[in-house]
Amino acid sequence: MDSFKVVLEGPAPWGFRLQGGKDFNVPLSISRLTPGGKAAQAGVAVGDWVLSIDGENAGSLTHIEAQNKIRACGERLSLGLSRAQPAQSKPQKALTPPADPPRYTFAPSASLNKTARPFGAPPPTDSALSQNGQLLRQLVPDASKQRLMENTEDWRPRPGTGQSRSFRILAHLTGTEFMQDPDEEFMKKSSQVPRTEAPAPASTIPQESWPGPTTPSPTSRPPWAVDPAFAERYAPDKTSTVLTRHSQPATPTPLQNRTSIVQAAAGGGTGGGSNNGKTPVCHQCHKIIRGRYLVALGHAYHPEEFVCSQCGKVLEEGGFFEEKGAIFCPSCYDVRYAPSCAKCKKKITGEIMHALKMTWHVPCFTCAACKTPIRNRAFYMEEGAPYCERDYEKMFGTKCRGCDFKIDAGDRFLEALGFSWHDTCFVCAICQINLEGKTFYSKKDKPLCKSHAFSHV
């Protein structure tokens, strides 16, 4: 152990961090250094033990006491440190250069470039597979040998055109194991590389064009390529399968088309409503409309059958009213359903006014003073007659004697000395105390309290 002393010139920061202490039962030591800091420049290293701080033994200091001691040093910090001697380095074994590095060849081989083989050909086997197969034949009983081989058959690598065991079982069940897709046959032919031969004279051998793909007929294609519902019928969860043949219905004749259109129009038109591009059907007689027609209340009508329910008048022009599902002309509706005016007792057919739980013609409900129709404006009732707001304030409005402002409806007021007062305006003319409900005196039409009854106003 090498002990040495380090003096750092202030001010802080000092560029190191402590760890350990008496409270941790671990000697104080340097845990971290700031790169380029004062401690790093003075040669302090991570892991140095702190023996003393500013001349005081650090072995009896806790972690917090050591930090406080360092903070109290001010402009000069003296540390006694101890550093473990580095262990003697062991002689290193001389490194010998490795032998020639292994060389890898990327030439094509039989294991990497396999040629295509026809369906059903056995997969290629190597020595390792043959040894494993012999070992399995020795260990596995004959009863389970076949099942093991069948279960592991799909694990062996096979070319992209090979068929899995489950697919061959499905083909055997459906009777299509000997059928072959013409598209696959054409792909086989196209994948064959033509042999290169010496060019012959053009006159001796005629040049043949490359045959294009022939369109397969529906009968020569397998059922999984022709029938889109093949996979659904032979799903694993089906207990039995039934093959059925469906024939496409013949194209309907124009007469059948016309009959279906008529039936659709008759069925859809009886319900009324919108036509949606179909032949309109009269809502009254339930017959197909040929030519002009009317649309009212969401239904189609013959023009001559859209009539008043009471007088039978054709309502093609002039407007109509609908009441409880029945249609009326204006005159019949006025006689039967129109309300009566409370003033003139006549039927109200145009604009109507509702006031005082009665109905009025708008020109009949007017101000009693200016004769102006009140319509939707505010009005006041006085002695059974309506008044507009302006005339009512002019004729019956009340002003406060104290503030000279109008006493609105709903305001609290009182009457005294022959005038009307707001309850807050009836006060003593001298001390302004409120006199509502109290004894007061009057002098020159001004209220006075009992204390100022004889004062000069």
Curated annotation (Swiss-Prot):
Q: Which Pfam families match?
A: LIM, PDZ
Q: Which GO terms describe its molecular function?
A: actin binding; metal ion binding; muscle alpha-actinin binding
Q: Give the SUPFAM superfamilies listed for this entry.
A: Glucocorticoid receptor-like (DNA-binding domain) (SSF57716), PDZ domain-like (SSF50156)
Record note on domains: The LIM zinc-binding 2 (LIM 2) interacts with TBX4. The LIM zinc-binding 3 (LIM 3) domain provides the structural basis for recognition of tyrosine-containing tight turn structures. This domain is necessary and sufficient for interaction with TBX5.
Q: How does it assemble?
A: Binds via its LIM zinc-binding 3 domain (LIM 3) domain to endocytic codes of INSR, but not with those of IGF1R, LDLR, TFRC, or EGFR. Interacts with various PKC isoforms through the LIM zinc-binding domains. Binds to RET in a phosphorylation-independent manner via its LIM zinc-binding 2 domain (LIM 2). Probably part of a complex with SHC and the RET dimer. Interacts with TPM2, TBX4 and TBX5. Interacts (via LIM domains) with SIPA1L1.
Induction details:
Induced by glucocorticoid or BMP6.
- Which keywords does this chain's UniProt record carry? Cytoplasm, Cytoskeleton, Developmental protein, Differentiation, LIM domain, Metal-binding, Methylation, Osteogenesis, Phosphoprotein, Repeat, Zinc
Protein's name in the database: PDZ and LIM domain protein 7
The reply on keyword Nuclease is no
Residue numbers carrying Phosphoserine: S78, S111, S247
What function is annotated for this protein? May function as a scaffold on which the coordinated assembly of proteins can occur. May play a role as an adapter that, via its PDZ domain, localizes LIM-binding proteins to actin filaments of both skeletal muscle and nonmuscle tissues. Involved in both of the two fundamental mechanisms of bone formation, direct bone formation (e.g. embryonic flat bones mandible and cranium), and endochondral bone formation (e.g. embryonic long bone development). Plays a role during fracture repair. Involved in BMP6 signaling pathway.
Modified residue annotations for Asymmetric dimethylarginine: R103
**Organism of origin:** Rattus norvegicus
Give residue numbers for the modification (Phosphothreonine). Answer: T96
Could you tell me in which tissues this protein is expressed?
A: Expressed in kidney, heart, brain, lung, and skeletal muscle. Overexpression results in the synthesis of an unidentified soluble factor which acts on cells in the osteoblast lineage causing them to differentiate and secrete BMP-2.
